Amino acid sequence: MRASPLLSLSIFITFVSIFSLLTYLPSFFAQISRIERQLEEELDEFLNIEHEFRKEFDIYPKNYERRQKKHVYSYCECEYINTCPPGRIGITGPDGQPGKDGLPGMPGSPGIPGELPNILYQQVFGCRICPYGPKGKSGYKGIDGPPGIPGWPGEPGVRGMNGERGSTGLDGAPGEPGSPGLPGFAGLPGSIGITGIKGVMGEVGEPGAPGIPGEEGLSGPTGQPGSPGSIGAMGYEGAYGDRGEPGPPGPIGRRGGPGLDSHYCPCPSRKMFLSILREKTKKQL
């Protein structure tokens, strides 16, 4: 019971952190593009300054006559340690135009402890190390190299947000009918229903043909006296049939409850009308 709140809290914190990370990515990429733009501007400014300096440097005439012709030998005449006195100071050039203020640079990361190469510890005999000359022109574009080795597969990306709910698809074709289920258990017996309203008295039907007298039945036990029925409407006088032999009175059964079709009133049968007519004729006689 205690693990459920902690689990829900951890899931909520995870979702919040992922959402904050996704919202920070646009500003992060915007900051990177801004830094690249600043670096490009500073590099263009530096190239412009270099171009102007080279133009001003080319204005002054080159005095080749003052140079003494050096003797060219098959070996280098310079020494590793130069003890020659420095030359006189040249003419001071004109002041350059003040440059534009540069953009503030990003703070650099602390460097690692440096190590002096082993080459500098070695004693060099022969020519001294001269400074590098001016930067040469860019060379021609070389031939495209062969394709590199395929890199390692990258790490899986962050899972994207859930997309919007799609529209409801079309109804599929109806499936095949399933196999018939097992027969259900028998239901509990229903409660006794409410006695229905007495229906409208139907029309008197045509008198039926006299029936064949039945065999004399066994004498049944004396039944309990039934409740008197309601007096029905006077019917049309029918033809007198042959009087049959009186049979022994049968037992009166108890009244049964309504069946399954208790709300459906079937039409009265012809035998019911004949029994009502016979009772009325007996009472009149």
UniProtKB/Swiss-Prot annotation:
Its job: Nematode cuticles are composed largely of collagen-like proteins. The cuticle functions both as an exoskeleton and as a barrier to protect the worm from its environment.
Family under the similarity heading: Belongs to the cuticular collagen family.
GO cellular component annotations of the record: collagen trimer
Pfam families in the cross-refs: Col_cuticle_N (PF01484), Collagen (PF01391)
Alphabetized GO MF terms: structural constituent of cuticle
Keywords: Collagen, Cuticle, Disulfide bond, Repeat
Region (Triple-helical region), start-end ranges: 87-116, 133-261
Transmembrane annotation, as ranges: none
Compositionally biased spans, kind Low complexity: 207-231
Start and end residues of each stretch annotated as Disordered: 207-257
Annotated protein name in UniProt: Putative cuticle collagen 75
Gene symbol of the encoding locus: col-75
Quaternary structure, from the entry: Collagen polypeptide chains are complexed within the cuticle by disulfide bonds and other types of covalent cross-links.
